[in-house]
């Protein structure tokens, strides 16, 4: 959420070599934490189940500086308190605007990057999952697809990905937050041009992250529709069909209670409305092969406390029952319609400003039952073997693959900006051995992302055309 009207103007920082940030990445990792664990090849359903219940470090790194909106410096003790209460995920919203230089490198300030990593380490030290995003970045204008914006998205995400490429899969990347700058009908899906621009930027970001290699080759990446609104989920254009992508929405439901402080909640009709909305959201996304991260939700200090407790319990329970992860928006504000705060961060040691609401979240999550249909979701190993000449691909290279059963086959090649430069489709092939040549025309030397699909199986590889 945008909870502050602080200036979003883009500051220009001294240029620091991108390579330096990449080299610093491995040194960020806290020794002995789950950040050092091996990648586990979890299905999306298992990953979301493990995330369980989440908490936002709101109005902190998403401000112009960590303390710029009146927050204290984040400490290990704060995150320890969150973990002790039963939360297993920390979402770390980050504003990068004002912390990187100009084109063409858009180099991120190394001190800011190091602080983002240090806070992530606090959660990883407690074996928590961490989501890192780009927040309050309204310069990603969606009125049309801009090559300049796309290049900026690629540069920023390449640097973030390089800084965290050695981290385990406990770290996930959320491409944006509530992307809507320049969009029409922001909470109803936007226009065709808006959706095309967002899909292009997210596709470019995914390709850039995957191209950095290391653990980023299979890291979970989270995308969202315009404004991250669940109302327009059916209009969401899913970027590259990558098996390690999920969808985030922000569900302040019902709006009158959750955002406006309308007072009471808890009738049978209230409960039925939440179930209906979650069922519609999850069912549609399931048809796209995605699972859901409820990246922001909550209720406020303006609401009556008994209703807040009921709502917190029920919503946390039902999100898990429907196969999602509920992540509470905590902005460290404790009064009025903007009072989503739960943890009093300035207290030493940190304490819960609304302990009964925090406990309701924990109890609600504990009572939830994650759908077994998502737990048994499998990402089968690719049986369609691809020969890529040890990772180097020449223009005349033959792609060899085996189909264990009849299916359609497609091969797409993306440049590092996320633009499709080649799209080959073979329909209804019988079981057997095949080969496909990458066409030389229109493809120059350089790095690309190759996406190979056979039936429901995907493989995505970084390749180099000589």
What are these regions (language model features)?
Residues 17-27:
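Bacterial N-terminal signal peptides
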Residues 67-83, 153, 274-281, 312:
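Short, acidic/polar
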Residues 377-466:
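C-terminal outer-membrane/trafficking sorting elements
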């Amino acid at each position: 959420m945008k909870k502050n009207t602080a200036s979003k103007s883009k500051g220009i920082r001294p240029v620091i070599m991108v390579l330096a940030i990449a080299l610093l990445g491995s040194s960020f990792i806290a020794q002995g934490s789950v950040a050092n664990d091996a990648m586990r090849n979890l299905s999306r359903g298992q990953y979301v189940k493990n995330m369980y219940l989440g908490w936002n470090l709101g109005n902190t790194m998403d401000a112009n500086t960590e303390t710029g909106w009146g927050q204290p410096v984040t400490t290990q003790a704060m995150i320890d308190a969150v973990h002790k209460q039963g939360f297993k995920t920390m979402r770390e919203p980050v504003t990068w605007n004002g912390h990187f230089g100009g084109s063409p490198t858009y180099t991120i300030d190394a001190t800011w990057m190091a602080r983002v990593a240090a806070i992530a380490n606090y959660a990883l030290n407690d074996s928590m999952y961490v989501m890192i995003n780009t927040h309050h970045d309204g310069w990603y204008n969606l009125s049309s697809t801009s090559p300049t914006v796309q290049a900026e998205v690629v540069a920023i995400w390449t640097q973030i990905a390089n800084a965290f490429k050695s981290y385990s899969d406990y770290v996930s990347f959320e491409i944006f937050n509530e992307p809507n700058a320049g969009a029409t009908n922001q909470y109803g899906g936007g226009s065709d041009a808006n959706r095309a621009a967002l899909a292009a930027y997210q596709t470019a970001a995914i390709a850039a992250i995957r191209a950095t290699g290391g653990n980023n080759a299979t890291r979970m990446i989270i995308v969202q529709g315009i404004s991250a609104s669940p109302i327009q989920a059916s209009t969401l254009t899913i970027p590259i069909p990558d098996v390690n992508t999920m969808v985030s929405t922000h569900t302040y439901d019902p709006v009158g209670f959750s955002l406006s402080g309308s007072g009471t909640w808890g009738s049978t009709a209230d409960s039925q409305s939440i179930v209906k909305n979650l069922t519609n959201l999850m069912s549609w996304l399931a048809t796209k092969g995605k699972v859901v991260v409820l990246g922001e939700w909550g209720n406020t200090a303006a609401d009556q406390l008994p209703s807040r407790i009921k709502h917190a319990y029920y919503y946390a329970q039902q999100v898990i029952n429907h196969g999602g992860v509920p992540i509470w928006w905590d902005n460290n504000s404790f009064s009025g319609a903007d009072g989503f705060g739960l943890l009093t961060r300035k207290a030493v040691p940190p304490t819960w400003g609304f302990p009964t609401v925090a406990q309701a979240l924990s109890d609600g999550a504990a009572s939830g039952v994650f759908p077994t249909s998502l737990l048994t979701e499998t990402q089968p190993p690719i049986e369609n073997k691809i020969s890529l000449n040890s990772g180097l691909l020449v223009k005349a290279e033959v792609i060899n693959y085996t189909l264990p059963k009849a299916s359609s086959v497609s091969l797409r090649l993306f440049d590092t900006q996320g633009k499709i430069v080649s799209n080959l489709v073979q329909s209804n092939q019988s079981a057997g051995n095949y080969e496909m040549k990458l066409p030389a025309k229109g493809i120059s030397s350089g790095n690309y992302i190759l996406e190979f699909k056979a039936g429901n199986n995907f493989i995505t590889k970084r390749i180099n055309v000589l």
